[in-house]
């Protein structure tokens, strides 16, 4: 789904697919830009197997049920008559069609005397995220999905195989426009130092974060830092979908090696549930020092992070720390572009306030750096490279970067809705 759109406009054009024309659907991971349209596609292609990793088989229903609830709310809030795009019954029916694959173990699909072999590999982007190798009639196609090669605190980096020479490589390009200026561990240390300074001056540190993967990763980071006394002890508040997913992360961590996470972290950090239902930035007073770890990561309206942020901007003791990508059109993206003492408006509350709190950005992305992707392509030696999952400027960086390799392999920068032979 297109995260910048609402309603039917957010969906891919599934009408280009003939009825009953798909043999299988491979879900790479559970973020809604990949997962959100699956119930609709699955209904249109009832014969298709739905292939997922084991963690994804547990997480996807929770993500879709939350998406259903959000759409029900937005139906009236934003006057979107077609919402919800799917029902809870659709989610249950889809879950029954999930076929969970183990990482690194090939799975064969046969049809009309032909056989395709499919293998999932851990992609490191988020728990359950998969890259996909398709082997068919002597050819190999590798789809990275959203991928991260470096280790996180809760998750190992991608375990992609060495396949050179490869026939087709489908590459994500999310960070094509982003040049890394600091190593991940250095960014984590900088975040912890900012938290510590905020707490020591009696302030509140808000960390807006994506519910799936990012909140759980930050809980592990906070726990590890607290063990080493890198920031003063203080109340830590969490809420929303990120906390609802904790039990599933814990269960997966107990039964597999897919994730380094235990819900015992919540007790050791003395995590408190944020129970405030009504927030009025003009009258609500929050007590510091404290840390708030809340979704959404882009500070979208009507989310816990947005509501808490509205109460923090007026005090220079406070900090708001963004740890992932914020689309420029979202409140988070707009706040990052706002200068100190410049007025920022919280549209949900019709409330404007000069920015006096510290606003900082930390590069803790779940996507691989462009240079890492560049080196990955060179190592795999594909005959054809297909660029996906990135804005046009991001994909153009890769197009230009590989110009010198044009004699070695073809680079395809596809247009939406156009069919290509690879």
Say what each PLM segment does.
Residues 192-331, 388:
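Hard-cation-handling environments
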Residues 360-380, 384-422:
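Internal alpha/beta domain cores that form substrate/cofactor-binding pockets in large enzymes
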Residues 1-2, 23, 142-144, 148-150, ...:
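Acidic/glycine-enriched edge-of-secondary-structure segments
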Residues 1-26, 31, 35, 40-217, ...:
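His/Asp/Glu-rich metal-coordinating catalytic cores
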Residues 184-188, 269-280, 298-301, 340-344, ...:
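A general structural motif
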